[in-house]
């Protein structure tokens, strides 16, 4: 578990709301296996709480190193709602994962008090957010807000991030090298087409009339 929701529900408590759920797979797996696992979890949630969730579909934008999809549910006013789930497939995790209790913010409608999940350490989360700020494809104000808040109010020292950022950059290089090799193989397969008949352009042919 990582990202803004992890910050709010595990180490920090009263924090900004996050619109999505972010995870990292400890062992890479395919899209169908991940969504099936979420279906099993949401079935258990529905049995315990009566609140039904369902898989809505993949993100319209394809992602090379993550499984991104939407889960739907019915809100308190009977209106359909959905939230995004982003599951990173391969990630260089530098610090040890921490098993932390989920902070109860709504005593009546929240998780049981003994619920705990594996979460990224604060160092790991902030390092990822700093790296995200350098990515032109993913420049979000919330990442800057999180870094600023943790560095000021949270008493977090940015000098602690040199090592995890360096390790993550090395890990990212290996990951993207693997992705580029995968892309080259994919393009090679597309280029290895069998024999195809020649196409001849008939300029004077009349179009077929549809009935």
Language-model-detected regions and their locations in the chain:
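Structured mid-to-C-terminal alpha-helical surface segments
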Residues: 9-21, 25-211
């Amino acid at each position: 578990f990582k990202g803004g929701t992890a910050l709010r529900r595990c180490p920090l408590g009263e924090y900004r709301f996050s619109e999505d759920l972010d995870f990292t797979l400890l062992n890479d797996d395919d899209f169908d296996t991940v969504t099936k696992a979420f279906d099993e979890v949401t079935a258990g949630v529905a049995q315990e709480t009566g609140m039904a969730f369902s898989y809505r579909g993949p993100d319209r934008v394809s992602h090379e190193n993550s499984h991104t999809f939407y889960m739907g549910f019915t809100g308190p006013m009977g209106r359909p709602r959905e939230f995004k789930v982003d599951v990173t497939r391969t990630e260089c995790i530098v610090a040890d994962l921490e098993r932390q209790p989920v902070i109860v913010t709504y005593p009546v409608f929240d998780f049981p008090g003994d619920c705990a999940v594996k979460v990224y350490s604060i160092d790991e989360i902030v390092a990822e957010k700093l790296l995200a700020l350098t990515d032109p494809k993913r420049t979000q104000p919330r990442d800057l807000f999180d870094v600023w808040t943790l560095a000021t109010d949270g008493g977090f020292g940015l000098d602690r991030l040199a090592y995890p950022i360096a390790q993550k950059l090395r890990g990212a290089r290996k990951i993207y090298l693997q992705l580029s090799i995968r892309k080259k193989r994919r393009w090679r397969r597309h280029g290895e087409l069998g024999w195809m008949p020649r196409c001849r352009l008939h300029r004077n042919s009349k179009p077929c009339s549809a009935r």
